[in-house]
């Protein structure tokens, strides 16, 4: 009842501050401005996206029949695809996640691509839907509990990854109980003999990719220093980076590509960029991974090394940044591969290693979300466009 009383009071205050009664007509004009077509034959005015040049209006767009034809074409395509019943068993599974890619982001992204009429590749899929998201204990979800949901099919508590709702955030003892662990799609795929991999533009120990292989009571426990800072015991509750290298699921991953070198290195060691490691246990997890996987397994740190891998590569660990990979607009083209390039290399390796049994690949465009968090709209939208390229 209190909430219903507050709304008119706030509205009244806004009117008083303005010093005059709100003009409905003026407000309507501001919200829905009308533009003149202008005299230039090649000009085309679009809605509120400055500094972007759009293609001239197509002649056929002037006619109602053009738009009606598009509608009929779309309807025919959908009907045809639904009439052909697909009874084939899927061989390869690729899960693409655009973290932070809301409907408004898609709308702005289409304009960024060239106009409202543009479409992302995934918008042309035969089936498109929406899902509601929430954690077991919170209405507004984070990337941790949702990773457990879409990768394991289980609702979890806010801030936890790969564990059931029996584990509260930072509860080390509960994390240590195998009965609370939630298996991921990658675990199921490995049980079927399939090749598996993960790709992200964030750190490979971040919440979303961690749902593939980790079971943790705190998404921030990406290295042992973070576990200790929360009065946890790393020997009882291994950090996420340690789980990636030493857990049964992490050890079997054929492809691991993203950022996050600092979480794998001791604080006494600096990576290739000069950034110090974060670990307090003195372990170099990169070297541990290399000792586990010899012969045709490779560790790479640059785009050149990734694209130069031999056709005999069976496994690859690629860490291209101290933490998250740079935004595409800020990246060094020689040092940092694009998401599209990482996907292509991963598919080649997984196809070879699947031995005909198929593969599972998780792909995250994770920095869309970061751009929105930091109000970097252009970068969020450009990351969306880059994500779209990886899906095509």
Give the predicted meaning of each segment.
Residues 3-20:
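Cleavable N-terminal signal peptides of Sec/SRP-targeted secreted and luminal proteins
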């Amino acid at each position: 009842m209190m909430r219903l009383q507050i709304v008119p009071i706030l509205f009244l205050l806004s009117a008083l501050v303005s010093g005059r009664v709100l003009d409905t007509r003026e407000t309507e004009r501001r919200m829905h401005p009308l533009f003149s077509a202008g005299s230039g034959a090649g000009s085309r005015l679009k809605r509120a996206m400055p500094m972007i040049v759009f293609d001239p209006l197509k002649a056929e767009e002037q006619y109602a029949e053009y738009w009606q034809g598009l509608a009929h074409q779309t309807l025919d395509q959908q009907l045809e695809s639904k009439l052909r019943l697909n009874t084939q068993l899927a061989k390869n599974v690729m899960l693409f996640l655009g973290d932070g890619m809301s409907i408004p982001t898609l709308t702005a992204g289409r304009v960024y691509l060239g106009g409202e009429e543009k479409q992302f590749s995934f918008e042309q899929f035969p089936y498109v839907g929406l899902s509601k998201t929430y954690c077991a204990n919170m209405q507004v979800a984070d990337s941790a509990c949702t990773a457990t949901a879409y990768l394991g099919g289980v609702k979890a508590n806010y801030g936890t990854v790969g564990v059931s709702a029996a584990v509260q955030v930072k509860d080390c003892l509960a994390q240590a109980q195998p009965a609370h662990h939630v298996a991921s799609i990658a675990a199921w795929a490995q049980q079927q003999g399939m090749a598996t991999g993960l790709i992200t533009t964030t750190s490979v120990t971040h919440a979303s990719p961690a749902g593939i292989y980790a079971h943790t009571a705190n998404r921030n426990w990406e290295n042992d220093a973070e576990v200790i800072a929360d009065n946890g015991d790393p020997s009882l509750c291994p950090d996420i980076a340690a789980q990636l290298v030493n857990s049964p699921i992490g050890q079997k991953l054929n492809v691991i590509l993203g950022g996050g070198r600092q979480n794998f290195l001791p604080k006494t060691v600096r990576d290739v960029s000069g950034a110090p490691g974060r670990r307090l246990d003195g372990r170099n997890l990169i070297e541990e991974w290399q000792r586990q996987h010899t012969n045709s397994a490779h560790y790479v740190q640059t785009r050149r090394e990734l694209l130069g891998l031999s056709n005999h590569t069976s496994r690859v660990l690629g860490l291209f940044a101290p933490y998250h990979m740079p935004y595409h607009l800020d990246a060094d083209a020689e040092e940092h591969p694009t998401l599209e390039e990482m996907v292509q290399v991963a598919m080649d390796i997984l196809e070879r290693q699947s031995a005909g049994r198929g593969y599972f690949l998780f792909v995250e465009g994770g920095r869309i979300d970061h751009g929105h968090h930091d109000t970097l709209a252009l970068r969020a939208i450009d990351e969306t466009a880059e994500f779209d390229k990886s899906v095509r």
